[in-house]
């Protein structure tokens, strides 16, 4: 399922350092020649396509990025140090456009691709550059050139790693709000979610996955009933489905098992491949069940539902069980991502040979 993630950033390459006016001062040499060095180049700003990233969420909290200025020139023909470059890691598929004109400037399409997005300014000239046959003692220098400055809009079509399934009011929006940066509209009535909600779940530094909360499915969704049929087709691109079930519905006449079977039935009717996609069962709203009754309720549900896959017990409202579920999801997503990457071709000229066997010690 694809969504458009976007962020705005301001980047500034480093300015070049100024040149230096200096003359040599040597013993017994009253009028030394010019020896002022040039300024150093300002740092560049690069963007690199990182296959381990899948959203632009980090750039929402870190908008301004500046490279270092170049050092100033010095005497004794010493040039200024060049400014340090900075490299911004972005997901593969990121499109960089000019925030003011809308012109597409760059696209990161290949994993590992690195592009120069802001060039550092050249260093200024020292007075050594101005020496001539008619001017043996120049006192001229030039300042460094300014580095590029740009306001960029970053856009990324995000592929959701995890799709949430469930009847209306199963607690999907509460779950995505509890574990991610998404803030969906939540209320105690069905069909609160009218559009897909996208959330980025942060597990650690540069460790995240994307989860999509879809409008609740109802029986007949595969044939066009309700809201869910509009989004069923997008689930085919996800790597994992979480089937969230309300174990404690407000209406005591509602059977959670029957509802869960209806969801599975819609998947099977719509697409056999979607039905066979990895699907985990998440039993929600444990906080609504007495602690001494939980084990029996869960056991009864799993037995009647006849589910053979992984089962997780959580309360999205109190976040009980959510942390462990998130860690397990991340491990699964990374495993699938790794299996999807093509194997690197090995140049036969550089295959590492096994070490030679040790020679037996000679006996004297």
From Swiss-Prot:
Its main location: cytoplasm. GO terms for molecular function: GTP binding; GTPase activity; magnesium ion binding. Residues 160-334 form the OBG-type G domain. Residues 337-364 are annotated as: Disordered. InterPro entries: G_OBG, GTP-bd, GTP-bd_Obg/CgtA, GTP1-OBG_CS, GTP1_OBG_dom, GTP1_OBG_dom_sf, OBG_GTPase, P-loop_NTPase. It is an enzyme of class 3 (hydrolase). GTP binds at residues 166-173, 191-195, 213-216, 284-287, 315-317. GO terms for biological process: ribosome biogenesis. Keywords: Cytoplasm, GTP-binding, Hydrolase, Magnesium, Metal-binding, Nucleotide-binding. Mg(2+) binds at residues 173, 193. The keyword GTP-binding applies. SUPFAM superfamilies: Obg GTP-binding protein N-terminal domain, P-loop containing nucleoside triphosphate hydrolases. It is found in: Cytoplasm. It comes from the Bacteria. Its cofactor is Mg(2+). Pfam families: GTP1_OBG, MMR_HSR1. GO terms for cellular component: cytoplasm. Residues 1-159 form the Obg domain. NCBIfam families: Obg_CgtA, PRK12297.1, PRK12299.1, small_GTP. Monomer. HAMAP family: GTPase_Obg. Belongs to the TRAFAC class OBG-HflX-like GTPase superfamily. OBG GTPase family. An essential GTPase which binds GTP, GDP and possibly (p)ppGpp with moderate affinity, with high nucleotide exchange rates and a fairly low GTP hydrolysis rate. Plays a role in control of the cell cycle, stress response, ribosome biogenesis and in those bacteria that undergo differentiation, in morphogenesis control. This is GTPase Obg. The lineage of its organism: Bacteria, Pseudomonadati, Pseudomonadota, Betaproteobacteria, Burkholderiales. The gene is obg.
């Amino acid at each position: 399922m694809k969504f458009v993630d976007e962020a705005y950033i301001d980047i500034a390459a480093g300015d070049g350092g100024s040149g230096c006016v200096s003359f040599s001062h040597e013993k017994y040499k009253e009028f030394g020649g010019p020896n002022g060095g040039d300024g150093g180049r300002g740092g560049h700003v690069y963007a690199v396509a990182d296959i381990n990233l899948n959203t632009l969420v980090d750039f929402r909290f870190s908008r301004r990025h500046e490279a270092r200025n170049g050092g100033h020139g010095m005497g004794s023909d010493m040039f200024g140090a060049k400014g340090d470059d900075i490299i911004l890691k972005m997901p593969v598929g990121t499109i960089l456009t000019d925030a003011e004109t809308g012109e597409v400037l760059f696209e990161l399409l290949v994993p590992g691709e690195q592009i120069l997005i802001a060039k550092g300014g050249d260093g200024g000239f020292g007075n050594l550059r101005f020496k001539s046959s008619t001017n043996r003692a120049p006192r001229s220098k030039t300042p460094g050139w300014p580095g590029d400055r740009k306001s960029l809009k970053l856009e990324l079509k995000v592929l959701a790693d995890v799709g949430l399934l469930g009847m209306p009011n199963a607690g999907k929006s509460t779950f995505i709000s509890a574990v991610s940066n998404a803030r969906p509209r939540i209320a105690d009535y069905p069909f609160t979610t009218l559009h897909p909600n996208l959330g980025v779940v942060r597990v650690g530094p540069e460790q995240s996955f994307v989860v999509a909360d879809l409008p609740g499915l109802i029986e007949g969704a595969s044939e066009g009933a309700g809201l869910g049929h509009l989004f069923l087709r997008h689930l085919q691109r996800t790597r994992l489905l979480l089937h969230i079930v309300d174990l404690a519905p407000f209406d005591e006449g509602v059977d959670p098992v029957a509802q869960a079977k209806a969801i599975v039935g819609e998947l099977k009717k719509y697409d056999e491949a979607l039905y066979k996609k990895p699907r985990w069962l998440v039993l929600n709203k444990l906080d609504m069940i007495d602690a001494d009754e939980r084990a029996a309720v869960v056991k009864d549900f799993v037995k009647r539902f006849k589910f053979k896959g992984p089962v997780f017990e959580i309360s999205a409202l109190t976040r009980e069980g959510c942390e462990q579920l998130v860690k397990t999801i991340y491990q699964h997503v990374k495993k699938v991502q790794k299996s999807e990457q093509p194997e690197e071709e090995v140049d036969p000229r550089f295959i590492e040979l096994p070490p030679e066997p040790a020679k037996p010690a000679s006996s004297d």
